C-alpha cells in the first residue's frame, strides 16, 4: 500500500513542473488502499518561479566580453598599421637606394619572367613596383645614366615604364634575362587611345647583361626562327649583332690567358665563326655525297701472290663483305657466305688460267730436254768405260717400273710405283741399253686421265704436295727390241692426255698449286729438277 506521505511527496513533485491552466483540484487515481480525491492548491505549484536577481549579472558579463573583444581588435589594427608603415618605409628606402623595379600598377605584363643566375655565396635583391606611365627614349637614357652613376645593373623599357635593376653585395658579374612571347613588331610604341586610356605595347623578348665591363650596353633584339621579317628589319645588321653576341659568349668562357674555364671544354678546337659557317655550308654537300649508289662501291679482292698466299705468309682469307642495299642487282646483292663463295670461285678460275699457261709451256721444255738428252747420248757413246747402274729404290724392278710408268702413267693397279732418282749427268745403264732418260713434268691429276684421290694409300710415299710427279720416258736405240714402247706411242699417249685435259676448265686447287710450283722450278733452272725425297 502507498502511504499518505508518499502520496503527498508525489503531489509535491508534480507541483514543481510547469503550471498548467487547470482547476484548483486535480483528480488522482489511487490504489486500492487509498480512496478519495486529494485537493492541491494551484498556488503551491507556482511556488518555485524564476529568480529576478540573475538578470543584471548576465548583462554585466556580456558588456565585459564585448569590451575584451574591442580591445583585441584595437591591438590587431595597431599591429597591422605598424606593419604597413614598416613596409612603406622599406619601399621608400629601396627606391632611394636605386634597387626598385617600377612598372605600371594594375597593368602587369603577360608572361613576364625574370630569371637570375645566382652564384653561391651572393645575395640579390629584386623588387618590383608596377606604376602607370610611359617610357620614352629620353627617360630611359636618364635612367641608364643614373644606374651607371650608382654602379647598378641596366634598365630597359618595353613601351611602358619598366625598370629592372638587380643589386649584388659584391658588385660581381651577373646576367639577367627578361623574356616575353614576341607577337608583333618590337619597335611599336605606346599609342594613346581617343578616350585617353593608355595601351600597352606588344610583349617582346629582351636579353640584358649587367656585366661590369659592359654596363649600360644593350644586347640586340632576338627574333625566333620562322617569324616573318619585320618592317625596317635589316638582316645584315642583325647577323653582325648575333656574331658579336656569340663572340662575347665565347670570351666569357675563357680566362685572361685565353684558356677554357670549364674542364670539359679543353678538348674543343679553337675554331672561329667562319669555320662554323663553312661547316654549315659543307653539311648538305657531304650528306649528299654519302647518299650515292652503293653499287659503285664494289668490293675488290686483295691481290694474290703467285703461291696463292696473301700478305704475311699465310693463306689469304677474303674479308667479310659489307651488306649492300636492296637496290643492288646481280652479284652485288650477295652478302656474307654467298659473297665469300663467289670470291672463292673467282680465285679458282684465276688459278686454273695460270695452270693452263704452265701446261702450255711444258711441251717446249720437253723438247729442250730431248735435245739435251741427244747431246748426252753422243757423249755416252764415245765414252769407253761403263758407269755403274743407277740406284733405284726397288732394285732391279726400277727398269720395269720406268717402262710401265711411260706406257700407263699413274695407273691405280700399281700402288708400289715410286719415282726414280735420275740425273742427266749420269752414265748409261748396262743390260737393256738406254741412251738416257727424259723427265717429263706432269702436274698431278691435271694431265693424267686417271687421278688418285687425295689422302688415299695409292699416293706415292715420300712425296709432298708441292712436288710434281715425274714421268720417266725411255729413249731406246734402233737395235732395241719390241718389248719397250716407242717414243711415238709415248707422244700419242701424252697428246691424248692433253686432249682429255682440254674440256676441263676448272682444275682442283691442289693440282694447280703443284703445277705452278714445278713450273717455277723449270723456269729457274732451265732443266728438270731432281725428284725430292722426304
Curated annotation (Swiss-Prot):
PANTHER family: COILED-COIL DOMAIN CONTAINING PROTEIN 9, COILED-COIL DOMAIN-CONTAINING PROTEIN 9B
Coiled-coil ranges from the UniProt annotation: 60-97
Biased amino acid composition, Polar residues: 201-211, 401-410, 456-467
UniProt xrefs under Pfam families: DUF4594 (PF15266)
PTM annotation (Phosphoserine): residues: 201, 392
GO molecular-function terms, A-Z: RNA binding
Keywords, sorted A to Z: Coiled coil, Phosphoprotein
Biased composition (Basic residues): 288-297
Ribonucleoprotein found in the keyword field: no
Compositionally biased intervals (Low complexity): 382-393
Keyword Ion transport applies: no
This protein's name: Coiled-coil domain-containing protein 9B
Gene: CCDC9B
Organism for this UniProt entry: Homo sapiens (Human)
Chain positions covered by the region annotation Disordered: 173-237, 274-534
UniProt xrefs under InterPro entries: DUF4594
Composition bias type Basic and acidic residues, residue spans: 173-183, 329-347
